[in-house]
């Protein structure tokens, strides 16, 4: 089987990445719907698109093939027209569209070509678009928008030669996974060539990609958070370890505090070089508040080593932790809120970051890390950074370096 996914680290030279260009779903956000849709603010779409285009240009300028989930999903339906009606059925079912609107919605969505249909599924559909006027106080949508599709890190995760197709924590976001699931099962580029290590219909437990960090070819680090459970990690690990082509033997599970600051592991902790990590001070200041587990073929056990000791053991060298916001409590809080730890590596020691996090950027540069910056006045309103907005599909394998 020809390999279509190759991600054995967070820092290997990035060759192919999957993103979503912000669309009309941004303009369907209202202050009243933010909590329901798990978004933190109302961005200005035109500026968000410009910021995102600048972000993807940096990646292309650095030799990265940039793929878009909306285009891949549409291409899949173009390649396999027989899938279209079944996919529409699935979307209508998972969007929880009321029975009285289903026929009208189906007629509307079916009238669009595949690309416009996928974009409309993501954007959401207002009742007024279908000529339904129930008054100002009525709920405005037949199908809710999916603004978090912007964050392609979460619905699935590339691990080694395969992926996890995640069961997400909220009903609001779980519908996002139907697009990559369609692509990896049926797109001519990927079909029958990508092993699944987790399935979106495993409903008992949840796991999200923002909690999964691919440290190297043997070890993963996964956060146990509000959105990712230890049982889900164990279920994923069992399938991963039992794949004869998998090189993985260990998962370090960090049982983090279940708070907004620790929503996902990558909101507080990211790998940026062979021996360098960026972390919010809370992850170390609260070290006594969470447990660390090691998951292996032998089972799950609590370990008493510190996180730095575990990282050094796994990396085979002493590691350096760069504190987001430095030692300034105010700066650390502000920059963590604006995704200061959430950078994406183009290669070892070269990352893309939001330019607004200038304290952290200065510390990174002083530590020898090359930092490319992007504007983020609008992109940051969703509380996700460059790592959140990207899912690597191919990274070059890391070269061993002398210690």
Curated annotation (Swiss-Prot):
Mainly resides where? Answer: cytoplasm
User: Which regions form coiled coils?
Assistant: none
Q: Name a single GO cellular component.
A: cytoplasm
Question: Gene name on record?
Answer: arcA
Gene Ontology molecular function terms on file? arginine deiminase activity
Active site annotation, chain numbering: 388 (amidino-cysteine intermediate)
Give the first-level EC class, as a single word.
hydrolase
Record organism: Mycoplasma capricolum subsp. capricolum (strain California kid / ATCC 27343 / NCTC 10154)
Q: NCBIfam families of this UniProt entry?
A: PRK01388.1
Any one of the GO BP annotations: arginine catabolic process to ornithine
For this protein, the Enzyme Commission number is 3.5.3.6
* Name of the protein in its database record: Arginine deiminase
One Pfam assignment: ADI
Task: Give its localization.
Answer: Cytoplasm
